[in-house]
From Swiss-Prot:
Pfam families for the chain: Glutaredoxin
Name assigned to this protein: Monothiol glutaredoxin-S12, chloroplastic
Function statement: May only reduce GSH-thiol disulfides, but not protein disulfides.
Location relative to the cell: Plastid, Chloroplast
Keywords: 2Fe-2S, Chloroplast, Iron, Iron-sulfur, Metal-binding, Plastid, Redox-active center, Transit peptide
Gene Ontology molecular function, alphabetical: 2 iron, 2 sulfur cluster binding; metal ion binding
Length: 285
């Protein structure tokens, strides 16, 4: 899968959250010794310390663009989000730090997102262990300095990493051998008009089957918008959808994204609109 897609932040199991999240144990937390990850016999990815990373201001309004990609890169790394008063609220890791921060500021109250510190991995595709060790190091540094974990990393706090509420992929028919009582084109029309945002993709929302579909899903998720997906490759439940949809939308390729019953376009158009802030404005209408 393409690592450049705007995916959601990596979710770590609750068992990996620091025991110091409980006040009684915060002063005794000890992480296992850090060992540099190796690939081909060479150590990789040296991360900046939390205390040495420079804060980057986060605009309070989601409609305002984030700082440029040099300040907040769309790359793998570790990041810490601070409230406007300068208190660390959450430490996370991501394959796309920029997309993760964008997703946070759209879902988390504005009084929790004032600035962010970032340290980017040396490699384009670092091993997960490398990122996890950086995450542990930042948490350990903060806990050593303050005696407690950031609120968002405390077990039971779902403000930042709550389980995603994803609706299942929609199916247009019960099965390919079931006789339809209405034309397939009418089902498509009803679907795109009854749901604010619909993405017709190759594969499922959780497992897109092409890079373009994966990128579209990542962009929509990073905007925090509610959307439904339809798998155009599902010949059992969406038999004939691809050809019928091409005629309905007068658009020859997939994915296809509809907003408010109108076709927005495919991956290139959606990506361009997202970069210009036009997609966020469209979702607010």
């Amino acid at each position: 899968m393409a690592t450049s897609s705007a995916a959601a932040a990596l979710r770590l199991p609750a068992s990996q959250l620091p025991l110091s999240a409980r006040p009684s144990s915060s002063s005794t937390l000890r992480f296992p010794p850090r060992r540099p990850a190796r690939r081909g016999g060479l150590a990789v990815s040296a991360f900046t310390k939390l205390s040495e990373a420079s804060p980057v201001a986060i605009p309070p309004e989601p409609a305002q663009p984030l700082p440029d990609e040099e300040a907040l890169p769309p790359k793998p790394g570790v990041y810490g989000v601070y409230d406007p008063a300068g208190e660390l609220q959450f430490v996370g890791i991501s394959r796309n730090v920029r997309a993760s921060v964008e997703g946070h500021r759209r879902k988390v109250p504005a009084d929790l997102c004032g600035s962010v510190k970032v340290s980017i991995a040396d490699e384009e595709t670092p091993d997960r262990t490398v990122l996890t060790n950086a995450w542990k190091s930042w948490l350990e540094e903060h806990i050593t300095a303050t005696g407690k974990a950031p609120p968002g990393n405390v077990a039971g706090n779902h403000t930042w990493v709550g389980p995603p509420q994803r609706p299942p992929d929609l199916r247009l028919t019960p099965g390919r051998h079931v006789q339809l009582t209405v034309p397939l084109e009418q089902l498509i029309d009803r679907l795109v008009k009854d749901n604010k945002v619909v993405a017709f993709i190759k594969g499922s929302r959780s497992a897109p089957q092409c890079g373009f579909s994966q990128r579209v899903v990542g962009i929509l998720e990073s905007h925090g918008v509610d959307f439904v997906t339809v798998d155009v490759l599902d010949e059992e439940h969406n038999h004939g959808l691809r050809e019928t949809l091409k005629t309905y939308s007068n658009w020859p390729t997939f994915p296809q994204v509809f907003v408010g019953g109108e076709l927005v376009g495919g991956c290139d158009i959606v990506s361009s609109m997202a970069e210009k802030g036009e997609l966020a404005a469209l979702f607010k209408k």
